[in-house]
Amino acid sequence: MTRVKRGKITCRTRKKRMQSVKGFRGAWSTLSRPAMQGSLRALNYSYKHRRKNVKTFRRLSIVRFNALIRNSGLPFTYNRLIALINLYNCRLNRNVLSQLGIRDSNTFTKLMKFYYH
């Protein structure tokens, strides 16, 4: 049986793995096996936290909405506002409305009063 030398492939794989764990501390940035574990862990956490970010920013936009509605003096809350917007088929999504409220609160208040009456 012929001899199979895998040095190049192994070196290439390890080099790629070590480049992906630059900045890690301890053995995770210097040794091959812990580096593999560390990179897999990092990829797993990055996936989880991307999903978590969506929930966090949604929660933030709801808090912003409630604050903006209270400041405008209208007698309803976030869930009532979303129900009215869906009722009138408003094409602006929650993120756009939240940014509108932050950047131009007068227009936001006029828009909410339009949907309220």
Swiss-Prot record:
Q: Name one GO biological process term.
A: translation
Give its localization: Plastid, Chloroplast
Q: Which Gene3D superfamilies match?
A: 6.10.160.10, Ribosomal protein L20 (1.10.1900.20)
Concerning its family, UniProt says: Belongs to the bacterial ribosomal protein bL20 family.
**Taxonomy of the source species:** Eukaryota, Sar, Rhizaria, Cercozoa, Chlorarachniophyceae
What's the protein name? Answer: Large ribosomal subunit protein bL20c
Q: Which InterPro entries match?
A: Ribosomal_bL20, Ribosomal_protein_bL20_C
Keywords, sorted A to Z:
Chloroplast, Plastid, Ribonucleoprotein, Ribosomal protein, RNA-binding, rRNA-binding
Molecular-function GO terms, alphabetical: rRNA binding; structural constituent of ribosome
Protein's job: Binds directly to 23S ribosomal RNA and is necessary for the in vitro assembly process of the 50S ribosomal subunit. It is not involved in the protein synthesizing functions of that subunit.
Under HAMAP family, the record lists: Ribosomal_bL20
User: Which gene holds the coding sequence for this protein?
Assistant: rpl20
Q: Name one GO cellular component term.
A: chloroplast
